[in-house]
UniProtKB/Swiss-Prot annotation:
It is found in: Cytoplasm; Cytoplasm, Perinuclear region; Cell membrane; Cell junction. The lineage of its organism: Eukaryota, Metazoa, Chordata, Craniata, Vertebrata. Residues 791-809, 844-864, 1030-1039 have a biased composition (Polar residues). Gene3D superfamilies: Dbl homology (DH) domain, Pleckstrin-homology domain (PH domain)/Phosphotyrosine-binding domain (PTB). The keyword Aminoacyl-tRNA synthetase does not apply. This is Pleckstrin homology domain-containing family G member 5.
Amino acid sequence: MGTGPGVSGRRAAARPSSELPSPDSQLLWVGGHAHSSDSQVCHHADCQQLHHRGPLNLCETCDSKFHSTLHYDGHVRFDLPPQGSVLARNVSTRSCPPRTSPAADLEEEEEGCTDGKGDRKSAGLKISKKKARRRHTDDPSKECFTLKFDLNVDIETEIVPAMKKKSLGEVLLPVFERKGIALGKVDIYLDQSNTPLSLTFEAYRFGGHYLRVKAKPGDEGKVEQGVKDSKSLSLPALRPSGAGPPVSERVDPQSRRESSLDILAPGRRRKNMSEFLGEAGIPGHEPPAPSSCSLPVGSSGGTSSGINESWKNRAASRFSGFFSSSPSTSAFSREVDKMEQLESKLHAYSLFGLPRMPRRLRFDHDSWEEEEEDDEEDEESSGLRLEDSWRELTDGHEKLTRRQCHQQEAVWELLHTEVSYIRKLRVITNLFLCCLLNLQESGLLCEVEAERLFSNIPEIAKLHRGLWGSVMVPVLEKARRTRALLQPSDFLKGFKMFGSLFKPYIRYCMEEEGCMEYMRGLLRDNDLFRAYVTWAEKHQQCQRLKLSDMLAKPHQRLTKYPLLLKSVLRKTDDPRTKEAIVTMISSVERFIHHVNTCMRQRQERQRLAGVVSRIDAYEVVEGSNDEVDKLLKEFLHLDLTAPMPGTSPEETRQLLLEGSLRMKEGKDSKMDVYCFLFTDLLLVTKAVKKAERTKVIRPPLLVDKIVCRELRDPGSFLLIYLNEFHSAVGAYTFQASSQALCRSWVDTIYNAQNQLQQLRAQLSAQEHPGSQHLQSLEEEEDEQEEEGEESGTSAASSPTILRKSSNSLDSEHCTSDGSTETLAMVVVEPGATLSSPEFEGGPVSSQSDESSLSNTASSVTPTSELLPLGPVDGRSCSMDSAYGTLSPTSLQDFVAPHPVVEPAPVPQTPSPQPSPRLRRRTPVQLLPRPPRLLKSKSEASLLQLLSGTPAARGVPPAPSRSLSELCLISVAPGVRTQRPLQEGGPGWNGPGMCDPCHGPQLSESENRPSHMTGGPADSARRRCREMPSGTMSRVQSEPPSGVSAQHRKLTLAQLYRIRTTLLLNSTLTASEV
């Protein structure tokens, strides 16, 4: 340690002469300092005051008398106790001779050599040789432990030496006596432990740890009272009036400056143990009595008092300076200092108000702009003023109806909740965020990232201030001015542009989860941040809300807008106002859907990144030698984060299913694999040794090239992989652990194929927006051509169903079996084999016969949807005999139609009008297709095809009704019944939804009894489902209202004409036979 500011002569580390100073000893004044050959000279301010403002010559006895009672920072102490602890082993004592050479870390001084008689030698300056510095071999921080007091009384932290061969009670007893704490009324805990320590443990074991002192249950009051009594007894004696100025005012400024420099740079001088530890801190030395806390009265009769500023917590300050070289102790001391600074700052905020935003965040603003912003904030505060109820804005609210009052309440709730939300946003920005930034300006909580904690909440607050000022305030001002009702349609201006105004919410909703996690981590690990948040949550503006609750407000507010608007809509009667509210609701819900989509895609990307991290290598191809391996290395990779082929780049590949399976390829042995099914591909991987990562062992299988089949073996299924030519290039058999899991894999694969097909259709619609317009134009042209044709040229002609495609190879009518009514049309891919073994017989049963029930004119309304048919009700009147003649029972159906109740028809000349025919529709997907074979079968062929062998089945055939009878029934009011959607054909699974595997089908077997099922239609439909999605023809299904509307246009005369035509057809057919 260096000497004090007022000491000259020998250094503090050297012991003074043990002899008493002689009365006639001579003083030598060199450079303004007194030197004595056998005594020390003290220039301390207090010592000069005691010696009539002159330097004081002290021997060892006098020094012990005058300087042992009080502690002076930077003042030399001559009476050092003997070494009694490892902490004082580097101090010069009687048992350890003083060092005669300067320390290695001191600056070189000029020292004059004196002889034994006290004469100064005239020899030249001698430069002492530096010696190697002795360094500690132990960590000083482990030779002591920190004592924290977890009491209701403010007690400073103590640092206690951890001595060997001493128990914890023996070491803590002097400290507790000085604090006035009874050792038996408190418990000692180690760090964060909740188990009290035994006082018999060796104290040395706790070196470098924190010990907490906590009062035992029931003794809290006694411990607090003892500490208070101890503090009152240990107060220093006050100096009487007139004794002179305080000591702190009499200190020389130069001495104060040197003292501060010594404290700031303790490594520049030798440490004096007595200066830092004091007599109470050195083990083996008895502390001075509490009563000797003032300097003795000098010869002048004046008294001196202690220093109030340095009286509190001397030991803690000495230890912090002594252990400044230890990282852990210095960090703790800095933490204590920062906590005190934080508490003082927060206390100032509570007393003098919250601070403004730091200027460093307003570097682009001038002073006059800041003044304008302050004025704007005041205006905003006044603009957020809202009446207690909407009734204060309206005159004559007593005369309003109940429904009008409810509507005004709903509108008022929208306004009131908006004001409350803006105020909560201001609490976040002005209380939490602004105080945090100001604390960081002061050097506190600099490790906290404000943007990571609060995201873009300032942008959201600015957004809502603008929405309030530009949209909602005018509505209020209008109501205040006109004293009229609040009009919900006035909000359309702001909510119509909801998507563009509320864009900052996209970022906040994406980062909200990260902000919450970051906040929880800070509250768990950062004491300063925890204290700051606790203070802020107790502020009156926070209204007892937690910071986590405040951060969740933006997300909650966004989802509340549709609910508030729908509440207004339910209580509104005006059609124009309803239309405006519906527009606002759709705009808000569209934006919320967009936000949900962004969040879902972000979650899928995170999930996909987790899957990618689990895939270790891509080892699909093995090289034959090193050269091949080097060439292959460039291509042995798989990027799952790349966009899916044929879909929008915004779409993210999703993980649909994963799990362990047992795979068998060909005739090889089975192997355990781990499969990942994504939206567009299937990955077959194998676990590596660590079992946490996998490697790809088979090429990725594209979902649209997969054909999935269930096998007879329970829990197993087959995957056939096709190439671009629809040829099989691979077959994999997978075995699941259960039948349910196997079914789950098969269903998920089908769902993935459908989902991929939908995504590609959406991209095609976006890239070719004019294709739908072109399709509608073609449909209009076809309708005009059909309306211009006349069908009355031949009595033998019958209504026909027009073919869908004009580029077919076979477009002529097939007149097999002598029937003239063409009922169905077949569209079959060339080379497709859909025939069933049950119906392979004769040239009539071709491959087009079976598929005629599944792909028949998808745009036509099925006959079964117009009216329910019984099991034998669906017979045609012209087919009751083998020759096509009419039976007596069928003739009764053509008598004057009784169900039709109409007024007497006006006689009119029958005009040539087109016979009722079904409209032609173009396909949905206008893509190049291979030529299709179009074949039609007569009704007789259809009956034979549907019933198979009637004799074998024993059930008579059930043909369909004739077209004339259908038309008669369709025009009868109240006769036609509406069938459920699920009965309208297998293609109708819901409103507007078409079965992804097979299109709308015109099947008569749907209306037949249960014992008639299982025919070729079911077989064809099952085979269609098993076909790959790439080969399925997609058709468009339309609701059954078009055909019925067309039939309603027929008059009674036209129906009679149709009946006559059918009778003539039957007669001619019989005569020809």
